[in-house]
């Protein structure tokens, strides 16, 4: 592992604890390293000096849709591309507005979407790809990362906060649907992810 892996992993763990200041501080410390990346213009792999904090996320972290379709989200052109660092900074900005009682419904909804999308079920799996976590896009997650990456607690926390501040039926219906998605995922966790070979829950 290199220093970038270490700082990035600390930032990822801090994010899932909702310790956003700590996540930002750790992500900012990722150093520049030489990385092989695909150059679309030349169609070849090239070496570039990059920081892990500057890695572009493949989808808008704050969008929430009826259907989870990673490929659909990744194919869309982003009006505002987010890096791992700018994503964290935007979450901090929204959480500050919530603390100031500023447009709580919309900010809580968007932060809830951020936590949902950064889970295994969302469109931002790339956020948690890290050599120390040992995650890089497989169809499942490692046993030791299940609670971290399959958990819906933070998404539900912010969706419930948004629900409390909903002012019309459309807003209430939207939150009800998003909460239903988290409950569906919790069912999937129990039915498929948290069972060992004997069928007992972890």
Across the structure, where does each feature detected by a protein language model lie?
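Extracytoplasmic/secretory-pathway proteins
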Residues: 1-202
């Amino acid at each position: 592992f290199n220093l970038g892996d270490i700082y990035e992993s600390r930032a990822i763990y801090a994010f899932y604890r909702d310790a956003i200041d700590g996540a930002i501080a750790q992500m900012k410390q990722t150093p520049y390293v030489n990385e092989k990346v695909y150059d679309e213009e030349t169609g070849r792999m090239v070496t570039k000096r990059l920081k892990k904090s500057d890695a572009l996320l493949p989808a808008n972290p704050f969008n929430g849709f009826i259907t989870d379709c990673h490929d659909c989200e990744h194919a869309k052109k982003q009006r505002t591309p987010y890096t791992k660092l700018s994503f964290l900074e935007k979450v901090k900005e929204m959480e500050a507005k919530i603390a100031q009682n500023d447009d709580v419904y919309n900010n809580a909804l968007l932060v809830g979407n951020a936590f949902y999308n950064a889970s295994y079920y969302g469109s931002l799996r790339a956020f948690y790809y890290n050599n120390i976590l040992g995650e890089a896009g497989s169809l499942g997650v490692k046993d030791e990362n299940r609670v971290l990456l399959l958990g819906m607690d933070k998404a539900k926390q912010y969706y419930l906060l948004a629900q409390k501040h909903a002012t019309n039926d459309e807003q209430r219906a939207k939150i009800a649907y998003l909460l239903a998605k988290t409950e569906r995922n919790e069912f999937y966790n129990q039915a498929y992810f948290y069972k060992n070979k004997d069928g007992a829950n972890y």
